[in-house]
Amino acid sequence: MSKLTIAIDAMGGDVGPHIPILAALKSLQLHPNLHIIIVGNRTQLLPVLKKYQLSEHARLSLIHTDNEISMEVNPVYALRHRSDSSMHIALKLVSQGKVDACVSAGNTGALMLLAKQALKTLPGISRPALISSLPNMHLGHTYMLDLGANLQCDSHTLFNFAVMGSVLCEKVDQINSPRVSILNVGKEKNKGGDVLQHCAELLKQTKHINYAGFVEANELFTCRSNIIVTDGFSGNIALKSCEGMGRVFSEQLDKAINSSLYSKLLGKLLRPILKKQLKHLHPDMYNGASLIGLRGIVVKSHGSANEIAFTCAIEHAIQETQWQIPASISKKLETVLSERDDLSHE
């Protein structure tokens, strides 16, 4: 197995550095070829590393910096005045080729701006996109992008999202010709504005993309599409609505189970079954949104992620490294754009 090296911004999230360190420990145990560089404040990190016997680990090292980017910092300010932050240093390690990927639970806006500056976009890509997977009752999961990096998109940007999502699905999930759909207010061909209509036409004309039509928001978890394409505004709202409904469902279920002695006894019997059946719906299993379209691999973890969730984010970074996702996207995009040029000259 070839060596893999991941940089982790340990100062990003909402819950302190112990979560990324615990996740790093788990990932090192799972992958004997993995090396991890933790970036952050030595004073805060060393006690945690020593607690979990990681301070002398042969495959883990620490880069010290006093500075971090909080969730409240304006992204533009972070770009101009936080060049020595843990997030920026982790991204620089990727751009310098010293690590294969970067994982951060920090400020999303700052991460996107800093990553675009440090790594640049791939040829033919004007805007990177956030992509993550959602649980799907038929397929196991479905990828959706964009999830908030680009609030407004033209048809060509959405088209590029479809190409990038297809490559990720083809490589990571080993699916030939994955089905691509566009999120819309209806499934009918005439629904949606000019941007969606034009994007649909572009996808129909591209033989290297398996376009499957429009999909509505109520089908996110049941559709037969492997990739759902949308602008960042709609994608972010859809994602957070799903997360909110999941929390409501969980809270109401606990409330119902604890409402009486009978329900508590019944709940004790049903809980193991429910836990097993609903495990694939747990948001921790889907943590880790990749910022694709860049010349390097960057994975954004949820700010409040626990150990399991952050480990999943690291796993995403490992998979994308193993499948060389940026290079694969660049190759596919070159083929698709060449095909479009040929069509325009016919």
Swiss-Prot record:
GO terms for biological process: fatty acid biosynthetic process; phospholipid biosynthetic process. Its main location: cytoplasm. The keyword Metal-binding does not apply. Keywords: Cytoplasm, Lipid biosynthesis, Lipid metabolism, Phospholipid biosynthesis, Phospholipid metabolism, Transferase. InterPro entries: FA_synthesis, Phospholipid_synth_PlsX-like. It catalyses: a fatty acyl-[ACP] + phosphate = an acyl phosphate + holo-[ACP]. Pathway: Lipid metabolism; phospholipid metabolism. GO terms for cellular component: cytoplasm. Belongs to the PlsX family. Homodimer. Probably interacts with PlsY. This is Phosphate acyltransferase. It comes from Psychromonas ingrahamii (strain DSM 17664 / CCUG 51855 / 37).
